[in-house]
């Protein structure tokens, strides 16, 4: 009977939670705490996280309200805390990238698998029309202690926002 079938679960890969900004925005190093403050609405202006910034309001855009990316942020990054008022949703990850490309004050949140330039078979080149944010677990983010969601940094633990991807397999003959 089907009720006696027990699925097997296997980790098959990793995906990073990536933060992206407009290509004209050079503010690309943030701490985990900076990003949490942005996501919860405690930091709503660029000057709240980048002293002296004149960029204005921060708009945060996700792929959609019920996506795995959104759920991961609520559960694993914000630990159940509510999103701020500056959060909005597109319908797809491509729309997030397009929105960030067209809106200089925005931050997009997508899976890192959407970032790679498909023309680069080594997967070490990110899309040219956006900047990928580097994230630090330290109290102050610098280029030396902040990491982009490259596969190597997802695997070795330097990049802090990593999701494990699983395959669930059911063998009806077991």
Question: What residue spans do the PLM features occupy?
Answer:
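Exported/periplasmic ABC-transporter solute-binding proteins
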Residues: 1-174
């Amino acid at each position: 009977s089907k009720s006696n079938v027990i699925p097997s679960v296997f980790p098959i890969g990793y995906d990073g939670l990536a933060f992206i900004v407009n290509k004209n925005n050079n503010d690309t190093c943030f701490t985990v705490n900076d990003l949490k403050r942005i996501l919860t609405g405690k930091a709503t202006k660029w000057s709240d996280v980048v002293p002296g910034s004149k960029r204005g309001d921060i708009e945060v855009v996700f792929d959609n309200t019920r996506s795995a990316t959104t759920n991961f942020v609520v559960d694993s990054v914000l630990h159940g805390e509510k999103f701020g008022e500056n959060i909005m949703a597109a319908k797809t990850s491509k729309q997030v990238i397009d929105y960030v490309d067209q809106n200089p004050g925005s931050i997009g949140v997508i899976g890192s698998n959407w970032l790679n330039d498909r023309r680069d078979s080594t997967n070490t080149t990110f899309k040219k029309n956006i900047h990928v944010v580097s994230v630090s677990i330290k109290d102050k983010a610098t280029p030396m202690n902040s990491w982009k969601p490259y596969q190597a940094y997802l695997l070795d633990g330097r990049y802090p926002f990593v999701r494990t991807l699983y395959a669930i397999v059911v063998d009806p003959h077991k």
